[in-house]
């Protein structure tokens, strides 16, 4: 599966596209059929909060160290294998997905490389406490709230600011 655009991701998971460059995806609300094992080639940035067990990730033959209440992140050019381990339950995951062009001419775009957790060399997820999960979800809620409003002159600035806030919490 190739995810080069937000539309491709949203189509794959069966959710509406509210903005062409950014999406907040709740996997448990997805309308897509669950596939037991597949590869994802990212052309966008993706930050996943996994709240439950039920799937494994790997880069090539290297397993990704993550479990419940963990954050995983991917940058354009990365490929990951997803394996659903329990077909009876859809994993509870929330993702923030954004196209690299969305960051053009922003401070975050100029500094995105400082967030080393996007790197292939990092195969460990960020493990969160209950309180940290709450903060993570609050920031995603703010982004989602902005996505549910019509796009205006402030949309991009507000969303980019919240993306940066979320990334800073992950440092």
Task: Give residue spans per PLM region.
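Generic protein-terminus/edge-of-domain signal
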Residues: 1-58, 62-65
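Conserved hydrophobic/aromatic beta-strand scaffold that supports enzyme active sites
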Residues: 24, 47, 71-73, 95-97, ...
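Histidine-centered metal-chelating micro-motifs
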Residues: 54, 72, 77-83, 103-104
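Short acidic-glycine-tyrosine-enriched beta hairpin
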Residues: 61-75
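A hydrophobic/aromatic-rich effector-binding and dimerization subdomain
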Residues: 83-148
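An amphipathic alpha-helical interaction segment
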Residues: 134-171
């Amino acid at each position: 599966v190739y995810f080069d655009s937000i539309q491709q991701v949203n189509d794959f998971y069966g959710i509406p596209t509210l903005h062409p460059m950014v999406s907040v995806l709740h996997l448990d609300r997805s309308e897509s059929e669950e596939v037991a094992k597949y590869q994802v080639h990212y052309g966008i940035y993706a930050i996943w909060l996994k709240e439950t067990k039920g799937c494994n990730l790997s880069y090539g033959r290297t397993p990704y160290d993550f479990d419940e209440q963990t954050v995983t992140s991917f940058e354009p050019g990365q490929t990951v294998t997803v394996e659903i381990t329990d077909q009876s339950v859809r994993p509870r995951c929330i993702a923030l997905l954004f196209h690299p062009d969305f960051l053009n001419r922003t401070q975050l775009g100029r500094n995105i490389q400082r967030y080393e957790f996007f790197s292939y060399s990092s195969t460990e997820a960020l493990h969160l406490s209950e309180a940290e999960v709450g903060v993570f979800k609050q920031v995603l809620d703010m982004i989602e709230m902005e996505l549910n409003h019509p796009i205006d002159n402030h949309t991009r600035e507000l969303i980019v600011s919240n993306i940066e806030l979320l990334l800073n919490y992950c440092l």
